[in-house]
């Protein structure tokens, strides 16, 4: 689950992570009123959407007067902001964050992530702040420093200090940077985050260490113990199909292609998408029905896939372990009849009760194209979509 920058900064502020003063606003008039509450002559007007790259896309403006605050607010509110993370359709700006300006001395990057190679939380930092960390990693990886954190001990002060020295935090600010990083680690752990990222972290002319941005992602599996975080969810920022999928415990992520995919298991889903790409197709989604799919679940999965107007065909790739192929087959037949599917459909079944499942599909009388392997299924659906 993601939240807005202003919400992330409220969490930071409540847990001892230093941030500039700021206020959220939903209208241009409110933006001016909120700016008046700040003790500043310079204001930063920030579009609030669930996407990075806002600055490059024109979503962050520096205002030197209240009239400029109003001008920028009118310019941004209601705008479709297009960044490298939104896709070409962009996202509508419905709220702004009005923040006091800072005397920035230097910008840095800091973030806590879970390193899958070590299975531990890792602190990443760089003195190349204000730019995409992916670019830094690709072009100058030597400028990224890491500290692997022992989960029993937590982030040690000496690790935080070492990072501060490595990224050339001014000596007079190292103490504040150390305190900042320790507090930030506490946010990551206490709030069950999957990512906490600040880009940029800045040092100021008067020696402060501040978070000018706040990106927090939360582990969905831990939200049951964070009712306060759940209340911050902005459904308007999420794909309606992903919201609908979550109601049925389906993992759905929309993509840009035209071949709908229904698979059980994240690994098989990724392999399926790679195979479709290999044979010249483009997946329209990642959809994992999980290990306990029922007829109802399969039907809802079809409805969600077909909710994407770009879908021109569907590939169902199921390996029945816990899940039985005959149950999936019954669900597919019921779903095809209910949604009155007219698009090409290729189904590959393997595993428990596979022969019974194949028989159900064959005897249904429906236009379902069988496939013996994942590669054969991918080739068939790519061909059918191109011929359609």
UniProtKB/Swiss-Prot annotation:
GO cellular component entries: cytosol; succinate-CoA ligase complex
Stored Pfam families: ATP-grasp_2, Ligase_CoA
Residues binding Mg(2+), per UniProt: 199, 213
Catalysed reactions listed for this entry: succinate + ATP + CoA = succinyl-CoA + ADP + phosphate; GTP + succinate + CoA = succinyl-CoA + GDP + phosphate
Binding positions for ATP per the UniProt entry: 46, 53-55, 99, 102, 107
The ATP-grasp domain, residue ranges: 9-244
Cofactor: Mg(2+)
Gene Ontology molecular-function annotations: ATP binding; magnesium ion binding; succinate-CoA ligase (ADP-forming) activity; succinate-CoA ligase (GDP-forming) activity
Entry keywords, A to Z: ATP-binding, Ligase, Magnesium, Metal-binding, Nucleotide-binding, Tricarboxylic acid cycle
Family assignment from sequence similarity: Belongs to the succinate/malate CoA ligase beta subunit family.
Protein name: Succinate--CoA ligase [ADP-forming] subunit beta
Organism: Staphylococcus epidermidis (strain ATCC 35984 / DSM 28319 / BCRC 17069 / CCUG 31568 / BM 3577 / RP62A)
